[in-house]
Swiss-Prot record:
It holds the Pfam family Toxin_35. The lineage of its organism: Eukaryota, Metazoa, Ecdysozoa, Arthropoda, Chelicerata. GO terms for molecular function: toxin activity. Keywords: Disulfide bond, Knottin, Secreted, Signal, Toxin. This is U1-lycotoxin-Ls1c.
Amino acid sequence: MMKVLVVVALLVTLISYSSSEGIDDLEADELLSLMANEQTRKECVPKHHECTSNKHGCCRGNFFKYKCQCTTVVTQDGEQTERCFCGTPPHHKAAELVVGFGKKIFG
């Protein structure tokens, strides 16, 4: 009986050790991922800034992520170029207005 308890204790120790090693590896990978996300967040394009070269890099606003909105600009030479900026789409503006109004009414 004593041998069985020793073997079970040994197995539990080995399993907990191996799982903690896996958890440590997982935590390290997760930490690296979070650091990469933080770096990306620092490099996002603010509202009203140009996003022509980085159309998916707009920052987050109060409720929604800003969208890269593009327009075609005709230069004096007659060339058409696309210019983009990060902004809030009209349906997001409406949602923010409703939420703000609701907060004023309901506290």
